[in-house]
């Protein structure tokens, strides 16, 4: 098992973890229905870029 040579200070530990933060997902408002969904994904009602591409649940 690997063993560290020198102790990593709290400052260096924080710098090492600086890229681990989570970001909120980008959201897109559909211009036709006003529903919010992720960009490049199908909206919950089955619309993509203003066209109906799949049947929504319950149709």
UniProtKB/Swiss-Prot annotation:
Q: Could you name the domain of life of the organism this protein comes from?
A: Bacteria
Q: Name one GO molecular function term.
A: structural constituent of ribosome
Basic residues biased stretches: 49-59
Q: Name one Pfam family in it.
A: Ribosomal_L32p
Segments of this protein annotated with the region Disordered: 1-59
Q: Which HAMAP family match?
A: Ribosomal_bL32
From its record, what is one biological process in GO terms? translation
Q: What is this protein called?
A: Large ribosomal subunit protein bL32
Which organism does this record belong to? Answer: Neisseria gonorrhoeae (strain ATCC 700825 / FA 1090)
Q: List the disulfide bonds.
A: none
Q: Which UniProt keywords apply?
A: Ribonucleoprotein, Ribosomal protein
GO terms for CC?
large ribosomal subunit
Family stated for the protein in its record: Belongs to the bacterial ribosomal protein bL32 family.
């Amino acid at each position: 098992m690997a063993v560290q040579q020198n102790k990593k200070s709290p400052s260096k530990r924080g710098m090492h973890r600086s890229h681990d933060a989570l970001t909120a997902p980008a959201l897109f408002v559909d211009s036709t229905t006003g529903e919010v969904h992720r960009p490049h994904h199908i909206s919950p009602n089955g619309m993509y870029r203003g066209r109906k591409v799949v049947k929504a649940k319950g149709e």
